[in-house]
């Protein structure tokens, strides 16, 4: 069968890469994210703990976003799953990101046979995030296409990659499904690199695997002989020297920043200065305790972040017109609608149906002059992530009330529940 990862394998030949030690296997994407974004080692948390569900969803947390924001970078998070998944909206806000574009702000047209968004949707949103600012940007993107579970029956009619040599039919089908998702994700890798190259801006793109899939793998099945190894690669267009090495997830950002001669962020600086020295890990444990649960002596009274300011999404939803339907209800026209858009009249959510990014139908709504209409992007548990400006219905027209959209300094109210 043909190579499932031609783009990644090409990157491995030409750019810095190696094994990537992660804190989990089979699940636990959020824990690998946490190590990457904070530089902290999950070894020093409780057994089975997810900091996204415990500490970081409730407390401001120094991160790569705060480190780069202090140098003038715009900071953006993207994920083609829902905003409350692993409490990411709360977590990314507490980590100091400027924006978070979740699935609620994407019109996902292509999904896997298991219903996960295909990663091809991400390229346009990564480009849009970088277009929102004039300065440099840090864009942290979490993809979801390769997510399990993996079907034991054949669900892909004409697979690009065919798996052979496995007698167990159910296991063969699981691997065939997975490897075909990997192939399409690799195509996304190639498309993203091409899109970044076409911008002709100094850029670094880091790809890493969060954990191995739930396939009953054993260490002897793997080339690295270690279940907690994935791979990473650092692409750039600025002439960085190829330097292959194996690194743990919590050292990734400090490694990348060091190659760029960037020395910002308490924990990242610690790794850059102390890695490989005596008591490096035991002192890291003390540093983490001081930052998370201690008196934050290391900050000397000046914490890098005391509260979040994040806005959900990049693009504003706007309304242009509303047209009565023949029998009852209305068609609402505008821009940037998604299937997570909900219409509110005088603060009450209406029964609506999403047709496309410019039209929503309201089948049971009755309007009178003076009614106020808004459209919100709504996640699980009715979390309103972002609201449009208010529009007054007057003589069949929509009159925009300028400046009435969600406060741009922060677009939603923190939720204290878990949705994972």
Protein language model regions, located:
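Solvent-exposed soluble domains appended to multi-pass membrane proteins
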Residues: 1-361, 365-420
